[in-house]
């Protein structure tokens, strides 16, 4: 039976700190991809934000560390076998120290692919190939509590147009992690006699990463 996730009991954590970048000298094409970084100091279970030239498939993405050694670590569960060749980049340890606990509704969009028409005058049936995927976007209604530390952190990121790493942990332990932009002004909305809410939008920058535990 499928491990079904529901939007209940979901923990939402936002990056509160991002460590200085550690130089990455190589990323293998393997499953999982192995990262070379001298004296990186990471431990298994840490989350890192990767910047990468060449291997664009991992650029701007959040990964969990596994198989950590003094000068190397793995991108847990990430199969890089068919990815482009890595040339240079870095890794930054993420601290997910800010909790958001005021969200009341969620709508997700994006992640679907554009398709490119490849039909020629010789074809009898149209053909197409997948192009680029659209960015994943999560739109929430939040209880309007202007003193809430989580909402204050979201507004600060929004005001500064700063990227923040985000982690959703579902009740069955499945996780979604990504780097993205926050959009919120903490403007109050709602209807007569109902609770006051405020909209929050998070748009992924780079592809999300998922984990089963």
Walk through the language-model features, giving the residues of each.
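Small/polar beta-strand repeat architecture
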Residues: 2-9, 14-44, 53-124
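Intrinsic-disorder/low-complexity, polar/charged segments enriched in Ser/Thr/Lys/Arg/Asp/Glu/Gln
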Residues: 32-34, 135-139, 163-165, 177, ...
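Short conserved beta-strand and strand-loop elements enriched in small hydrophobics
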Residues: 46-53, 91-95, 162-171
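Short structured motifs
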Residues: 123-127, 185-186
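Oligomerization/assembly interface segments of phage tail-like spikes and tubes
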Residues: 127-146, 194-209
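Short, conserved charged micro-motifs
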Residues: 147-154
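Soluble sensory domains of the PAS superfamily and closely related sensory modules
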Residues: 157-161
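Short beta-strand and beta-hairpin "edge-sheet" elements
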Residues: 167-212
């Amino acid at each position: 039976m499928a491990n079904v996730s529901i939007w209940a009991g979901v923990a939402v954590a936002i990056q509160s700190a991002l460590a200085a970048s550690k130089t990455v000298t190589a990323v293998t094409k393997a499953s999982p991809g192995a990262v070379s970084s001298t004296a990186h100091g990471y431990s298994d279970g840490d989350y890192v934000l990767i910047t990468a030239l060449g291997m664009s498939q991992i650029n701007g993405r959040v990964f969990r560390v596994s198989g950590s050694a003094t000068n190397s670590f793995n991108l847990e569960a990430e199969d890089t076998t068919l990815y482009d060749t890595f040339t240079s980049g870095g890794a930054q340890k993420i601290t997910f120290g800010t909790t958001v606990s005021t969200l009341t509704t969620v709508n997700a969009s994006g992640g679907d692919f554009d398709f490119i028409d490849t039909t020629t005058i010789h074809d009898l049936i149209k053909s197409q190939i997948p192009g680029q995927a659209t960015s994943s976007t999560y739109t929430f209604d939040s209880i309007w509590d202007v003193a809430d530390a989580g909402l204050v952190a979201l507004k600060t990121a929004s005001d500064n147009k700063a990227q923040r790493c985000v982690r959703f942990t579902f009740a069955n332990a499945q996780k979604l992690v990504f780097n993205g932009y926050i959009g919120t002004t903490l403007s109050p909305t709602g209807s007569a006699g109902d609770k006051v809410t405020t909209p929050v939008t998070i748009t992924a920058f780079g592809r999300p990463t998922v984990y089963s535990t």
